């Protein structure tokens, strides 16, 4: 009986290790942030927003496509009155930020006098976020706050006040939990780092 249990444990570990690596197109990725850690960090960020934004009815502006899962999970943890809308900006092709920022879907809400929280999946160079803050600033909001699931501090090219960062990560290319590699991998529950 002990041998069967031991064999089961070995097979489970082999299967787990196989599941830790995924292939997306021409690249392999390994789990770097498990779903349980992501959920904890999202909840912690939401609690800070609940505390800081109480009585302000913030407008959460989720940046598509990458932040849709983060935004949904974050909103489930927000307990204060708030609204949500979506904007789409692009600066990525494949695994590299192009620096070219194109507004695809605009903002229709009146932002004058509003408290705005930009909800982003990842702040990489910061160029996209800087452009977003500048664009929103022309609409006279009361304040603009940045909330990002992930931040790559060593890759930032501009100074940003990211008040609500769930996690700082190294300068690696990642997928999962809404982040993609050429539009694939967004559906993965964990976050994976490229290994080749």
Where does each model-flagged region fall?
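PRPP-associated nucleotide enzymes
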Residues: 2-196
């Amino acid at each position: 009986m002990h041998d069967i249990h031991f064999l089961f444990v070995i097979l489970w570990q082999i299967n787990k290790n196989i599941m830790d690596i995924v292939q997306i197109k021409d690249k392999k990725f390994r789990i770097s942030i498990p779903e349980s850690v992501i959920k904890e960090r999202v909840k912690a960020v939401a609690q800070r927003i609940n505390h800081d934004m109480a009585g302000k009815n913030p407008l959460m502006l989720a940046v598509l496509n990458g932040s849709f899962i983060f935004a949904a999970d974050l909103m489930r943890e927000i307990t204060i009155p708030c609204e949500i809308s979506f904007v789409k900006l692009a600066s990525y092709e494949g695994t590299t930020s192009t620096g070219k920022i194109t507004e695809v879907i605009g903002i229709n809400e009146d932002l004058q006098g509003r408290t705005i929280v930009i909800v982003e999946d990842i702040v990489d160079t910061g160029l996209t976020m800087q452009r977003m803050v500048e664009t929103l600033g022309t609409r006279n909001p009361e304040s603009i706050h940045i909330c990002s699931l992930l931040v790559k501090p060593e890759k930032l090219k501009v100074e940003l006040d990211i008040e609500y960062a769930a996690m700082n990560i190294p300068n690696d290319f990642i997928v999962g939990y809404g982040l993609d590699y050429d539009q694939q991998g967004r559906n993965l529950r964990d976050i994976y780092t490229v290994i080749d």
